[in-house]
């Protein structure tokens, strides 16, 4: 877990593409989606979902808030369909 936390960028995003294979339930879909939309959005969404599902969200609340704020901004700026992201 700490390894993943250390990978978070100062803006709240994650960009290491290895994380797609590590956290995606549907790797093919996530890989294809990352070709259509900002790959950092896909990776960050995957990490946020993983933390929420598998770890104490209170302990990681600041990390999650920063990531979610970044996601919200990028989704709006790039007009990304959140339904597509929710399928990953």
Where are these regions (language model features)?
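Preference for long, amphipathic alpha-helical scaffolds in soluble/luminal domains
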Residues: 1-88
């Amino acid at each position: 877990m700490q390894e993943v936390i250390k990978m978070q960028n100062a803006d709240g995003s994650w960009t290491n593409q290895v994380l797609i294979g590590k956290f995606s339930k549907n790797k093919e879909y996530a890989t294809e989606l990352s070709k259509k939309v900002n790959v950092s959005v896909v990776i960050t969404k995957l990490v946020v979902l993983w933390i929420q599902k598998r770890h104490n969200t209170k302990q990681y609340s600041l990390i999650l808030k920063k990531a979610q704020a970044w996601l919200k901004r990028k989704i709006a700026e790039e007009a990304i369909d959140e339904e597509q992201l929710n399928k990953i």
